[in-house]
Amino acid sequence: MAQYIIRPTRKTPTSFAIIIDSTSYVKAKDAVMAYKNSVENDGLGTYIAVATWRNPEAIKSLLKQWHSNKQQPLEGAVFVGDIPIPMIRDAQYLTSAFKMNQKSDWKASSVPSDRYYDDFGLTFKSLKQDAEKQLYFYYSLSPKSKTYLSPDIYTGRIKPLEIAGKDKYELLKRYLYKVARLKNAEQNNVLDHLTMARGHGYNSEDRGAWAGEQLALREQLPSLFGQKATVKFLDFDTFYPAKLVYLNEAMDPQLDVLLFHHHGAPDTQYLNGNQAVSGVEASIKNIKRYLHAKVAERAKKVGADSAVSYYAKQLNVPESWCREAFDPTIQRRDSLFAADQDIYTSDLHQLKTNARFVLFDACFNGSFHADDNIAGSYLFNDGNTIATIGGTVNALQDKWPDEFIGLLATGMRVGNLNRFNGYLESHVIGDPTFHFTDNVHPGFSVNLALSLHHRDAKFWMQQLNHPLPDVQAMALRQLWLSGYRETQQLLTKKYNTSKDFVVRMEALKLLSL
């Protein structure tokens, strides 16, 4: 199909674009139009661009063209279906943690990133298209490019799962119809139910970090701590195993936001390890489970008897404990125990997750490029989850995942949250236009401010004393981006005088850049 464009039917201050491949459009046309109409009814004129996209360059050209339209500038876009995936090389310093020798397999040593599309100031050299994964297009960040991220628009991915027994186009249709339905049914939904859940071995182990985050959230989202709202902080070692408690929380039909802090893989949320115990019997059980796994693995290489003998001597434990690794009954028991430790995509496929927005502060959970992935599994089920944010590669623990999260209560679209606190690997998976109704400071349109007054020093100077700390913090970011000549003095003053944690933290962060 030749490129086909449907233009916005509403004149709005800014616009949005749905970029979709030809097959997905034909298979899900009515659902796509329902989604477009729901976005337009929400005050955002919407383009649809349909094509058999041969490379990312054509898409980026369209986005830049629409963004430069002064009458209705583009504020964001979503990539629906099989849209080319930029695989970025020579830019590892723009990730939070990813470091890999680029001599390794290019699929593993490149970063899947839509910063290629949404950050117009980054410049790239095209390298090649992957011979096996036809959607993968490799780019090298030019040495002449700017060296920091400052996306001009927000973007998101709606790429249905490709799993056995499911038609990906049917999954796409059902998701788009769901979003259209909920945008209409919940147009007055405010952010008044939030849950944070932590997994083991992460910065979750630091009680100081845990306490500090709660203090910051109270400052960013004060209405959550009032009489008519609910906020929960769940800990991996309070509920053991935590899996069922966390899944129950994810299925809560009232839940607005679910924040996860844990380790992750494309198909796994890691929640628990062996339980910290002090009793003798419980400690022996932990040791035995450890031995069963180690002995079974070593036996594949050296045989059962040799593996049993090795670990019995190495760890000074009875051989009988080691030999249990080959008992089918114990193998099944250990397997069930291990399955209860973590959340897998196979669990989510059977459930209805309802948290409207889920943030994964975890490695790999946002791997939209994988056929099956955690973020997509929260979206493509019969629940009410609309949007997620996650990373396509590993993630640093010592970062600020909640930066600007207080602006969600003012109606900020989740796409803008990722635009201003994301890394090279960070992506919205789902509808990036999703937002809550502003019940905090009606009259201040944060989305229009971030689009029409981006880097507008005069406008943001007027927001420095805004009653909401996160608006003040955003004002500091915008002034820094604008090149305001007295930025350093202003940041120093704010750090020394502000009563708000998040404002001081934003000032300190910007001073360090």
Model segments located where?
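Cysteine-dependent hydrolase recognition
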Residues: M1-L513
